[in-house]
Amino acid sequence: MDTWTVLLILQASLVLPGAVGTRTNTRTAPTPILRFVAVGDWGGVPNAPFHTAREMANAKAIATTVKTLGADFILSLGDNFYFTGVHDAKDKRFQETFEDVFSDPSLRNVPWHVLAGNHDHLGNVSAQIAYSKISKRWNFPSPYYRLRFKIPRSNVSVAIFMLDTVTLCGNSDDFVSQQPERPRNLALARTQLAWIKKQLAAAKEDYVLVAGHYPVWSIAEHGPTHCLVKQLLPLLTTHKVTAYLCGHDHNLQYLQDENGLGFVLSGAGNFMDPSKKHLRKVPNGYLRFHFGAENSLGGFAYVEITPKEMSVTYIEASGKSLFKTKLPRRARSEHQHRRA
């Protein structure tokens, strides 16, 4: 059975419960659900044809996933344009690496919510923000910002806080195992940290996600980002964040700590790296899944959020489902108590 057939069967199981092997005129209301794709490090190359085979394969697989399962939006986890970002809002890379690649009709009306990676910061991040006024599907309002959604046909809410981890921690070389040493502008870093601290303290949504380019935890080439482990992780833990999503390392990983906080690493949109160099730098028991096969065309994460739980499925660009996990909705008492 080919992988696209598997996706179609999965769609049927999600949308038409009880439909197999039974005849009935009773219609079951569709499950309230919010769906999105999370893909990082997809940004092509700076020379013709300005994309890679992996990026093209991921674009095709994302389109197939959207057609079969649906998606309300796509979350871009940074490194949108290799290797030195873009020059201005009219840079041809927007067309050649983004518009012409993610061009399937199924993707034309799916919005992208974007954040910057370290390679984007080697160019003009303000130009990527300005491109939001040119492309109807490119949404990048500011270096860091909040997204808020309601799960359709429910009162259940989801918040996603999009961070600029490069401004927060400093830049680094994506192809060398190098930690960001210090923020270029300490005042901007402190302002952003104060913002996310205030936002998380006030967050009353049923699911709270935080996204940034650099990982908190990673077993791969770059490993854990010391700056985020020190400054961001305590906030994620204190405020009962559901999951942190990131890229930077060029593979797929899922980690989960002793508090149930999930770490979704999806950095396989354009390159693949099998490194497990920092396996011993991550606490024992955190790693649940790692995929970095060099002969793979990469992949992405597909997230589904219902009133009951959030599921994360890692999908290879071939269409194969690699790993799936579930995270619970935040307990009402947790965030209501913090508001009291």
UniProtKB/Swiss-Prot annotation:
Record flagged with keyword tRNA-binding: no
EC number(s) per entry: 3.1.3.2
Positions with a binding annotation for Fe cation 2: 79, 118, 213, 248
GO CC terms of this entry: extracellular region
Residues that, per the record, bind Fe cation 1: 41, 79, 82, 250
Compartments where found: Secreted
GO molecular function: acid phosphatase activity; ferric iron binding; ferrous iron binding
Gene3D superfamilies given in the database record: 3.60.21.10
Cofactor binding note: Binds 2 iron ions per subunit.
Main location: secreted
Cofactor names: Fe cation
Pfam families: Metallophos (PF00149)
Broad enzyme group: hydrolase
Keyword set, alphabetical order: Disulfide bond, Glycoprotein, Hydrolase, Ion transport, Iron, Iron transport, Metal-binding, Secreted, Signal, Transport
GO biological process terms on file: iron ion transport
Classification via InterPro entries: Acid_PPase, Calcineurin-like_PHP_ApaH, Metallo-depent_PP-like, Metallophosphoesterase_PAP
Signal peptide: 1-20
SS bond partners: 169-227
Superkingdom in the source lineage: Eukaryota
Sites where a glycan is attached: 124, 155
Record's catalysed reaction(s): a phosphate monoester + H2O = an alcohol + phosphate
Protein task: Uteroferrin is a phosphoprotein phosphatase, synthesized in response to progesterone. It appears to function in transplacental transport of iron in pig.
Protein name: Tartrate-resistant acid phosphatase type 5
Organism for this UniProt entry: Sus scrofa (Pig)
